[in-house]
Swiss-Prot record:
Inhibits the expression or activity of extracellular murein hydrolases by interacting, possibly with LrgA, with the holin-like proteins CidA and/or CidB. The LrgAB and CidAB proteins may affect the proton motive force of the membrane. Increases tolerance to penicillin possibly by inhibiting the formation of the CidAB holin-like complexes within the membrane, thus reducing penicillin-induced lethality. Possibly plays a role in programmed cell death (PCD), triggering PCD in response to penicillin, and possibly other antibiotics, and environmental stresses. It comes from Staphylococcus aureus (strain NCTC 8325 / PS 47). HAMAP family: LrgB. Keywords: Cell membrane, Cytolysis, Membrane, Transmembrane, Transmembrane helix. GO terms for biological process: cytolysis; killing of cells of another organism; programmed cell death; regulation of single-species biofilm formation on inanimate substrate. This is Antiholin-like protein LrgB. Induction: Regulated by the two-component system LytR/LytS.
Length: 233
């Protein structure tokens, strides 16, 4: 019955995405934002487990899932809003911001590429991993454009964000990074959306820098990843 209904309506995929995310958001707040209960991570795990246990094929979910994905690309326009609001900070520290984000993103791409090549991952897997520095709304279109697997890219983005959310501030202490601009840029560049949360806990400067990094990293990924693909593949 479930399978029959799912095959004939996109509502199944939409509800399987939205309801677990909504419930996970409540759980996330109730547990004092415990990193393993990050909404994206929980809803992803639940969705995969549900499809596996019920035997419903992924293509059935994808009918509704593609509708949500359709709205991701125009949603990227919204990222211009926080950038505009923080334009004074951006102008004042533009050289540090551009330098930090540019170098950080390129180094991250080189590390991913080197590790993946040493591990002898298939090319489509490597291509799926490269855009993970950007937030999901930007990473998925980039992945599709270079021949990656969108679903694998989504997983990489989420896991990357969860790790930075959980350990980002610990890494800053480990490497004794105390400058608020550097700390904010580091968290925003490495952890995208989830990286802003620990930056907010550190202070307003860190939060501003992380928010700016979140947007600009997406721009760098869009510009640089295709160049990496052209050079190394």
């Amino acid at each position: 019955m479930i399978n029959h209904l799912a095959l004939n309506t996109p509502y199944f995929g939409i509800l399987l995405s939205v309801i677990p995310f909504f419930l996970a958001t409540i759980l996330f707040e109730k547990t004092n934002r415990f990193f393993l209960f990050a909404p994206l991570f929980v809803s992803m795990v639940f969705g995969v487990a549900f499809l596996y246990l019920t035997g419903i094929p992924y293509k059935t979910y994808k009918i509704g899932g593609d509708i949500i994905y359709f709205f991701l690309e125009p949603a990227t326009i919204c990222f211009a809003i926080p950038l505009y609001k923080k334009r004074e900070v951006l102008v004042k520290h533009w050289h540090r911001i551009i330098g930090g984000i540019g170098i950080g993103t390129v180094v991250a791409l080189l590390i991913i590429l080197t590790f993946a090549k040493l591990a002898q991952f298939a090319n489509d897997v490597i291509l799926s991993m490269l855009p993970q520095a950007a937030t999901t709304a930007i990473a998925l279109p980039v992945s599709a454009g270079i021949g990656g697997i969108k679903e694998l890219t989504s997983l990489a983005v989420i896991l990357n964000g969860v790790i930075i959310y959980a350990l980002g501030n610990k890494f800053l202490k480990l490497f004794r990074i105390t400058n608020p601009i550097a700390r904010g840029l580091a968290l925003g560049t490495s952890g995208h959306t989830l990286g802003v949360a620990p930056a907010k806990e550190l202070g307003p400067v860190e939060e501003s820098m992380a928010s700016i990094a979140l947007v600009l990293v997406g721009v760098v990924v869009v510009a640089v990843v295709p160049v990496f693909v052209a050079i190394f593949f």
